[in-house]
């Protein structure tokens, strides 16, 4: 049996790409073949994900479409005769981006508008969480594949002694509300732990948004907040091992893989119960 995976885009630190590659390993263990293709590819994953034009599916093959972004180039896949499964990873509502990145807002708006068309054209439409599945009008869930071993060993004891370290991991974007994380941290620091530190780990929406977060941090908690991007897997694991708490105040999440990572490292989690977050716990 062959299962071909189709993505709108593929990159080395993209959660959807990570999931697709995890599925490929699982399919291989089951003796299933197939190819992974994407409409756009970061060269760093070019050895594992091929251009969309490389898709060559036979009659009995299955196409697994990972839906996470506006993907007009994937419309042609819907016309193929093979059986098709759509897996929705969720697209953030555009309202969160208009004031910060209008182009991203347009892409999100188009992606959410296109989703029903794709869902209606496949044999099965599912979500990576019940929250996502219900956006499709159903309740079929294909769970996130999570391999704790890939993160490295959990810490053997409590975090190292020293000032409390609060951690956030995830994209630095408006809907994830790092601004509220900074404000909550400042309140905690002022009332309970003047020497506490906050580390925000993730790639920013753009330089302007990163600067806005840094400006807020410098205003409310000068010298106590650090923003980090582009960490290696080992560096990220070390941030988790040193953390005293993980704080997530996102207002839109289809799932939230960093919560699973925090659980793996034994870090206490405080998270706003929205979207797919309650399903993680």
What residue ranges belong to the model's regions?
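Glycosyltransferase donor-sugar binding loop
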Residues: 39-42, 197-211
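Membrane-proximal helix-turn-helix segments that form the acceptor-binding/catalytic region
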Residues: 92, 104-124
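Conserved donor-binding/catalytic core segment of Leloir-type glycosyltransferases
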Residues: 126, 157-176, 182-185, 199
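Carbohydrate-associated surface elements
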Residues: 131, 145
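Nucleotide-activated donor-binding/catalytic signature segment of Leloir-type glycosyltransferases, i.e.
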Residues: 202, 210-237
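Short alpha-helical donor nucleotide-sugar binding micro-motif in glycosyltransferases
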Residues: 238-243
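Aromatic "clamp/platform" in nucleotide-sugar-dependent glycosyltransferases that forms part
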Residues: 251
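Short hydrophobic beta-strand element within catalytic cores of glycosyltransferases
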Residues: 268-271
């Amino acid at each position: 049996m062959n299962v071909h995976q189709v993505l709108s885009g593929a990159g080395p630190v993209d959660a959807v790409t990570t999931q697709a590659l995890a599925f490929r390993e699982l399919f291989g263990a089951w003796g299933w073949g197939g190819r992974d293709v994407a409409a756009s590819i970061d060269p760093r994953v070019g050895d594992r994900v091929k251009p969309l034009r490389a898709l060559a599916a036979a009659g009995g093959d299955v196409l697994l479409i990972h839906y996470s972004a506006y993907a007009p180039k994937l419309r042609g896949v819907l016309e193929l005769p093979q059986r098709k499964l759509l897996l929705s990873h969720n697209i953030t509502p555009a309202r969160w981006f208009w004031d910060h990145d209008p182009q991203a807002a347009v892409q999100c708006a188009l992606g959410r508008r296109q989703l029903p068309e794709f869902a209606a054209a496949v044999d099965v439409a599912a979500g990576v969480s019940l929250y996502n599945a219900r956006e499709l009008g159903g309740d079929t869930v294909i769970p996130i594949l999570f391999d704790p071993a890939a993160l490295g060993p959990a810490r053997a004891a409590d975090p190292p002694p020293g000032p409390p370290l609060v951690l956030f991991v995830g994209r630095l974007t408006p809907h994830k509300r790092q601004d509220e994380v900074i404000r909550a941290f400042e309140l905690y620091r002022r009332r309970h732990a003047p020497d506490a530190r906050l580390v925000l780990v993730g790639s920013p929406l753009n330089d302007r948004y990163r600067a806005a977060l840094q400006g807020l941090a410098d205003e409310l908690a000068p010298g106590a907040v650090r923003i980090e991007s582009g960490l290696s897997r080992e560096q990220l694991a070390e941030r988790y091992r040193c953390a005293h708490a993980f704080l997530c105040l996102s207002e839109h999440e289809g799932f939230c893989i960093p919560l699973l990572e925090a659980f793996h490292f034994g870090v206490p989690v405080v998270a706003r119960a929205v979207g797919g977050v309650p399903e993680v716990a």
